[in-house]
Amino acid sequence: MRIGFFTDTYTPQINGVVTSICLFKQALIERGHEVYVFAPTPEHADDDERTVRFHSLPFVFQPEMRLASPFSMEALRVLDAVDLDIVHSHDPFAIGLFGLNVARRHKIPYVHTYHTLYPEYVHYVWETRLTQKLAERLSREFCEQCSSIIAPSTKVERYLRSWGVTVPIDIIATGVDTERYSTVNPTRMAALAEKAGLKPKERALLFMGRLGKEKNVELLLRAVWHSHLPNIRLLVGGDGPHRVYLESLAAELGISDRVSFMGYLQGEDAVAAYHLADAFAFASTTETQGLVIGEAMAAGLPVISVEDHAVEDFVINGRTGLVTPGRAEDLAAAFDELLGDEPRRAAFAMAAQSRAASFSIERQAERLEHHYEHAIATHRPRRIFPRLALPGRRT
């Protein structure tokens, strides 16, 4: 198949959506498909001739994000030369909507992965109940224009149905490169331990992700403060707009000597961070799938998390990790319980790594391939937003 990925979020950005796109792109290529990516154009050189960049500007509220032009002559030139079989969008914004029009003009299926629960992120613009309801309505109206939706978790599928989405939804989580996370470079691991100030007898918890308000890292800091373990350390791998606040909070709580902010970690450094830790700590309730949880489990880490539907697809409470109510005291008790019992922690670690195999990128890419095949076989052209239509043939 010739597949077009249309996304407003792509490299060099670092987030779960980009990780998902890159993993599926490579896995689909390895399965013999051609994958074209249409994405914003920050200062970044691509080594792939099948990546087409749209002009873009930094988003005023989050400079690392991009606002793309809704039109590209270069994209049209490529699309004229390439007969796509299917359009797969990863954002409902400028480039995603461009892809919607491409699908309409070429009368091919338009599949969309609903990566982000947008009503949970309106605080970056203007947080009110009205804006949340508006985000729900716009999400529903957009999804209703699609041939089908891919939900990365049962949580997302439930939300979409509750908002009134009626098109077919298939639950396909982003796969994990289990082979990559199962082995580690000892030299890189030792260097990262030194950078983090991790002492030999310390018990390390790891959080990996963007440091935004919605990730709830504040709760992890407060849980460390409540912990009774004298040798506990929280490793924070990531960066973002909330970092300065979190560093000041750690100082205010008097735990700066037990928290290591390591910035964004990529490649072997990210793998090394997972292998440095004894458990993975997670407190976000806005995730659509918690991709980092799968990565942690693939590296052999048990997970300690607050209750959330996105977590339940990965973590089996009492077997691959501990799931607690969303209070700092409860998280702290779970930290102490698991990190204070090494035989139990080791058993959880083995079970976690075994379970991660069921979420391998190879298995998930096969499921995505089947989704595409079904979408193509059953496709009937759908009417899209008239105001978004580009000049072209009518459906």
Regions found by a protein language model. Name each.
Residues 1-55, 366, 373, 384, ...:
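N-terminal subdomain of nucleotide-sugar transferases
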Residues 79, 143, 264-265, 272-277:
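Short alpha-helical donor nucleotide-sugar binding micro-motif in glycosyltransferases
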Residues 121, 171, 308-318, 322-323:
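Short acidic/histidine- and often glycine-rich active-site loop of Leloir-type glycosyltransferases
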Residues 182-198:
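A short helix/loop element that forms part of the nucleotide-sugar donor recognition site in Leloir-type
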Residues 193, 198-224:
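Conserved donor-binding/catalytic core segment of Leloir-type glycosyltransferases
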Residues 285:
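Aromatic "clamp/platform" in nucleotide-sugar-dependent glycosyltransferases that forms part
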Residues 302-305:
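Short hydrophobic beta-strand element within catalytic cores of glycosyltransferases
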Residues 317-318, 322-328, 337-343:
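Conserved acidic donor-binding segment of nucleotide-sugar-dependent glycosyltransferases
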